[in-house]
């Protein structure tokens, strides 16, 4: 279950930038997201969106329950107001210096550098309007509704203690939530002065003045967004309550970056608790740290990094991307995306280990020795050597299952690759080749039969990670998918079964492509900064030399009694400035800004 979170200031801001309506923008990006996930072979029962009728109905119903149960309070506050645009500026329309870390481009609701979300737009230093950076916001009073998280804290804390323990949350998810609770929860505004969003249900207000105040306000995106999981389910099935109103029989697993944790571990659960209704609540929270790019940070605005829509353009199959990204999933610490490493892991791991193991065995069975028919491997199947080999495979399988049950996805992938290595070691230790088949046919048949069944098991355990690879293995084996067993027998593909023809699972990536891709997708930030600084320095030196030359020429002309003029582009020089000043005014125009 997934979808696009479409309401909020970010949407309004982007729509303004692109010159379209918020609805047009959301339609565009919902399709882009859906197409990317389809290409990556990420499957959902439904990939939905939050700008729907169901979202409005469910969000407003939760709000009414909170209102009735006295968990909401109205507060007047001072908010930034743009006199030029005649409107209050929502958090994301304000940018400035983060009060926590000093980052100069922090938003009014969140700092992308340090991750802080526990400050307001008025806390920013050197605040400016995002729409028009030359405008400095003024402060005016506005009224908003807040959820009383302080009153809900004891219940949130009790729920969190139980859920995080039973659900074995990721450590960073627990630490972030504990930090919020330790500081003490405060009431938090859940309405905003925006147009694009879920409207406030005015029927809860008895006073006409209140209705007038709130008729042009909408819900804060992070009160509204988490309800999207529920509304998207409701878009999928009319029986959505069987999933979301059955806490005893349904377990909710959620996956996210660490900066979104508080909204899912505090605000949304608090909203659910406050309705006094039975809700399916978060069971397991799987959170990640940050994936960085070439020793720097990904940045869409600066074009640094390869993003989902770029991956397809490289011509590299989705499974290679899935393997690398899952192997580098930042589960416990930040990780790096590096092109050299990306290429190396395709060539030395996917191709050299998994690909070659599968190809070697299937080609052997395709050969004249077996004519694509699985030999009778039963004669020596119970031999202690082979029993021990199957035991080792089962040990790797057990570790894999344990990792997957704990949602340790990176470890699960490594466990699967360890099983492949065990398979490779198995056939190498027995020197499986034409000579063994000729001299010891029973032993060769047993090694081949066990190896074929290891490959069959690989198709199953790699399916969550490499679906296209899994499908190709099964097609080559001409065998059905094997549900991942708790214990592997090594006998699922029987003697006499005819397999298909061998195909390569992976291809070599030319290491020379590293430079091409690094240049195409921005390279390292350090290199980009170095180039920008060098260009700026060169431009400044050139401008200074030009200014010096103009000054020298001006003096010479002055000595000759000739009126000196200087030009700046196609414009005449300022008559109130000396010639040198007129020329140096152009320096800023050619200076490249560092970033």
What are these regions (language model features)?
Residues 330-349, 357, 364-412:
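Long, amphipathic alpha-helical stalk/connector segments used for oligomerization, subunit docking
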Residues 81-84, 287-290, 340-342, 375-382, ...:
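A glycine-rich phosphate-binding loop feature that marks nucleotide/adenosyl-phosphate handling sites
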Residues 1-2, 54-58, 126-367, 414-416:
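Structured secondary-structure scaffolds
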Residues 1-159, 165, 545:
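N-terminal, positively charged nucleic-acid-binding surface of large information/translation enzymes
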Residues 159, 392-403, 415-422, 426-429:
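Solvent-exposed, amphipathic alpha-helical segments
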Residues 40-42, 245-248, 292, 300-304, ...:
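Short acidic (Asp/Glu) and glycine-rich catalytic loops that position anionic groups and cofactors
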Residues 24-35, 61, 353-360, 395, ...:
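A non-catalytic, amphipathic alpha-helix used as a structural packing/dimerization or gating element
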Residues 75-80, 84-85, 96-115, 119, ...:
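Basic, alpha-helical terminal appendages of large translation-related enzymes
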């Amino acid at each position: 279950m997934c979808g696009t979170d479409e309401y909020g200031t970010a949407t309004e801001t982007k729509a303004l930038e692109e010159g379209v309506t918020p609805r047009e923008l959301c339609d565009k990006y919902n399709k882009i997201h859906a197409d990317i996930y389809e290409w990556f072979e990420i499957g959902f029962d439904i990939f939905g969106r939050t700008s729907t009728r169901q979202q409005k109905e469910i969000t407003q119903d939760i709000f009414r329950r909170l209102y009735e149960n006295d968990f909401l309070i109205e507060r007047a506050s001072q908010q930034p107001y743009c006199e030029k645009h005649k409107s209050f500026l929502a958090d994301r329309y304000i940018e400035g210096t983060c009060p926590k870390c000093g980052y100069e481009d922090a938003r009014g609701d969140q700092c992308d550098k340090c991750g802080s979300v526990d400050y307001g737009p008025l806390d920013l230093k050197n605040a400016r309007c995002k729409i028009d950076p030359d405008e400095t916001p003024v402060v005016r009073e506005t009224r908003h509704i807040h959820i009383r998280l302080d009153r809900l804290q004891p219940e949130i804390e009790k729920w969190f203690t139980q859920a995080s323990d039973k659900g074995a949350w990721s450590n960073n998810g627990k630490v972030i939530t504990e930090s919020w609770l330790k500081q003490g929860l405060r009431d938090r505004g859940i309405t905003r002065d925006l147009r694009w969003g879920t409207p406030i249900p005015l029927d809860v207000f008895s006073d006409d003045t209140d209705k007038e105040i709130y008729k042009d306000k909408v819900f804060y995106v992070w009160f509204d967004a988490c309800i999207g999981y529920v509304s998207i389910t409701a878009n999928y099935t009319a029986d959505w309550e069987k999933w979301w109103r059955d806490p005893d029989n349904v377990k909710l697993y959620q996956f996210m970056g660490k900066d979104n944790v508080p909204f899912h571990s505090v605000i949304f659960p608090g909203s659910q608790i406050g309705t006094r209704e039975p809700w399916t609540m978060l069971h397991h929270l799987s959170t990640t740290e940050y994936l960085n790019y070439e020793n720097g940070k990904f940045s869409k605005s600066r074009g640094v990094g390869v993003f989902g829509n770029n991956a397809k353009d490289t011509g590299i199959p989705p499974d290679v991307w899935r393997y690398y990204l899952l192997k580098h999933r930042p589960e416990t610490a930040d990780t790096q995306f590096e092109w050299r490493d990306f290429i190396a892991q395709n060539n030395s791991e996917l191709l050299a280990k998994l690909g070659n193991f599968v190809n070697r065995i299937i080609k052997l069975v395709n050969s004249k020795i077996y004519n694509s028919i699985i030999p009778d491997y039963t004669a020596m199947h119970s031999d202690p050597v082979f029993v021990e080999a199957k035991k080792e495979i089962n040990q790797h399988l057990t570790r894999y299952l344990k990792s997957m049950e704990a949602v340790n996805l990176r470890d699960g992938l490594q466990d699967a690759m360890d099983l492949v290595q065990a398979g490779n070691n198995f056939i190498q230790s027995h020197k499986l080749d034409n000579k063994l088949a000729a001299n010891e046919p029973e032993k060769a048949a047993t090694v081949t039969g066990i190896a074929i069944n290891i490959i069959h098991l690989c198709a199953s355990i790699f399916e969550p990670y490499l679906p296209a690879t899994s499908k190709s293995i099964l097609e080559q084996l001409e065998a059905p998918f094997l549900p991942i067993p708790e214990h592997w027998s090594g006998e699922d593909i029987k003697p006499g079964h005819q397999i298909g023809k061998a195909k390569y699972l992976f291809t070599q990536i030319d290491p020379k492509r590293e430079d091409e891709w690094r240049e195409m997708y921005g390279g390292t930030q350090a290199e980009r900064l170095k180039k920008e600084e060098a260009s700026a320095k060169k431009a400044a030196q050139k401008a200074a030399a030009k200014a010096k030359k103009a000054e020298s020429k001006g003096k010479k002309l002055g000595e000759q009694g000739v009126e000196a003029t200087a030009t700046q582009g196609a414009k005449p020089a300022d008559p109130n400035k000396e010639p040198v000043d007129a020329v140096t005014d152009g320096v800023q125009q050619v200076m490249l800004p560092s970033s």
